Amino acid sequence: GSALGILASEFKSVSRVLQPINDTLQTMPLFVLLIPFVMIFKIGEFTALLAVMAYAMVPAIRYSEHGLRSVPHEVVEAATCMGCTRWQLLWRVKIPLALPEMMLGLNQTIMFGISMLVIAALVGTSGLGQQVYIGLGDGDFGVGMTAGIGMAIIAIIADRMTAAWSVKLQERYTSNPAS
């Protein structure tokens, strides 16, 4: 998702193609999103993986593109005047400055993916999402809550890990901007 966001920030044509796709994926009900994948790939793990990826990568694309486009024009102009190539400008100036927003996009992608796992249980995944679905279907409060709490714990751990990684990367870029 972040790679597509970087491409979209660098090329307006890519952004124009991705924007309606992202808008559609973001506003489409989760159950409806499963239909085209089931029609093409039938029910199974691969179908669920594709549906989760399609739903979850939208924030990474949006946040990456927005973060890179939000880099102050003065900073870009100064780097260009100092002789930065387009590649150097992207990797040494824009990405380090957009990193907090890009990491927020990664965090949201992980959270969206975890939330989609319960819905993906409808197309044949196994795991905690399926246990939540089974608990719902059977009226087994204990199984559903245990699996739901497990998913919440995984989400909290993932959130803390991406936040710590973001801080670490920010420290790296601010302490040694030439790296």
Please describe what each predicted stretch is.
Residues 9-12, 41-43, 123-124:
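Short helix-capping/hinge motifs at transmembrane helix termini and TM-loop junctions
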Residues 2-7, 34-36, 40, 60-63, ...:
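Alpha-helical transmembrane segments of multipass membrane proteins
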Residues 60-105:
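Short cytoplasmic-facing helical segments at TM-TM junctions of multi-pass membrane proteins
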